[in-house]
Swiss-Prot record:
Oxidoreductase involved in the biosynthesis of akuammilan monoterpene indole alkaloids (MIAs) natural products, components with various biological properties such as antidiabetic, antibacterial, anti-inflammatory, anticancer, and antimalarial activities. Catalyzes the conversion of rhazimal to rhazimol. Pathway: Alkaloid biosynthesis. GO terms for molecular function: oxidoreductase activity. PANTHER family: ALDO/KETO REDUCTASE. This is Rhazimal reductase 2. NADP(+) binds at residues 53, 167-168, 189, 215-220, 289-297. The active site is at Y58 (proton donor).
């Protein structure tokens, strides 16, 4: 039997524990056929990953569910409770009356009775049937942050998701949500890496006891939308060389030392192991100071989700100026 990676966990404010490393299932087109993708995910499970991050808009829920079922049926894992499965409510379903049906559809795709974590994907709403990333002004609808969160709380009370949270929420939008929340968001999943450190959001979430989870911790290196600002950063390259680590390990260790978890995706088995070999060593204060000097810039502005005649008119408004 091949060796399995060991994953530390973080206890969320919902009293549930989440593995600090999640395997991302957002895959650029063309997405492999169902059976092929399920086989890929099953190999990831064999390596030892148990936290999987998906979303209704990724088109990967069904394949992930199939892999989870195969892992349980084959005895590779002891049962559903070994997994931590996250999915997300897409913007077209971000309405109080649409959330429960959307969650039930996600559970059906996955073949599961409950999610470990359900996130609001973005703080906005679009018309159902809108063409992905080709939105017109008619597609943008008012977003009821209070009603949407109330429906998320109901899903939690029904036992359909153990924890609920948000994704891509600024401090200001989180503050507005918290005004009426009876259940705190357990997680805010956001873009976070050494070139976008979330220096404003991270302390805010820590103060509110909301865990921050990083997507794009390496700027999606190796994908069609990748950038090299992390993996070819000279500060990280030098630190990695001095510590006999990979650049990715240094970048991920930095995120871990900020108290955040992260979502990774690689189909290279060696890197699957390398990316979690970050928990038994530390960055020095000098190295942290060097990383602190790296210029900052948000990489994904989500320009497609704003419209000058819509509820959110600019990226500045979407991110509340935190660019």
């Amino acid at each position: 039997m091949e060796k399995q990676v060991q994953m530390p966990e973080v206890e969320l404010n919902s009293d549930h524990k989440m593995p600090l490393v999640g395997f991302g299932t957002c895959i650029p087109d063309p997405i492999p056929p169902l059976e092929e993708l399920a086989t890929i995910f099953l190999e990831v499970i064999k390596v030892g990953y148990r936290h999987f991050d998906t979303a209704s808009c990724y088109g990967t829920e069904e394949a992930l569910g199939k892999a989870v079922a195969q892992a349980i049926e084959s005895g590779l894992v002891n049962g559903r409770e070994e997994f931590f499965i996250t999915s997300k409510l897409w913007v077209e379903d971000a309405d109080q009356d649409l959330i429960l049906p959307a969650l039930k559809k996600t559970l059906g795709n996955l073949g599961l009775d409950y999610l470990d974590l359900y996130l609001i994907h973005m703080p906005l709403r679009l018309r159902q049937g809108a063409e992905m990333f080709k939105y017109t002004k008619e597609d943008f609808l008012p977003f009821d942050i209070k009603g949407t969160w109330k429906a998320m709380e109901e899903c939690s009370k029904l036992g359909l998701c153990k924890s609920i949270g948000v994704s891509n929420y600024s401090c200001e939008k989180l503050s507005k949500l918290l005004e009426n929340a009876t259940i705190l968001p357990a997680v805010n999943q956001v873009e976070m890496n050494v070139v976008w450190k979330q220096s404003k959001l991270l302390p805010f979430c820590k103060e509110k006891n909301i865990h921050v989870s990083a997507w794009s911790p390496l700027l999606s290196y190796g994908s069609i939308w990748s950038q090299n600002a992390v993996m070819e950063n000279t500060v990280l390259v030098d630190i990695a060389a001095s510590k006999s680590k990979t650049v990715a390990q240094v970048a991920l260790r930095w995120i871990y030392e900020q108290g955040a978890s992260f979502i990774m995706r690689t189909f290279n088995k060696e890197r699957m192991y390398q990316n979690v070999q970050i928990f038994d060593w530390e960055l020095t204060q000098e190295e942290l100071d060097q990383i602190q000097q790296i210029p900052q810039r948000r990489s994904n502005l989500a320009e497609a989700f704003v419209h000058p005649e819509g509820p959110i008119k600019s990226v500045e408004e979407l991110w509340d100026g935190d660019l």
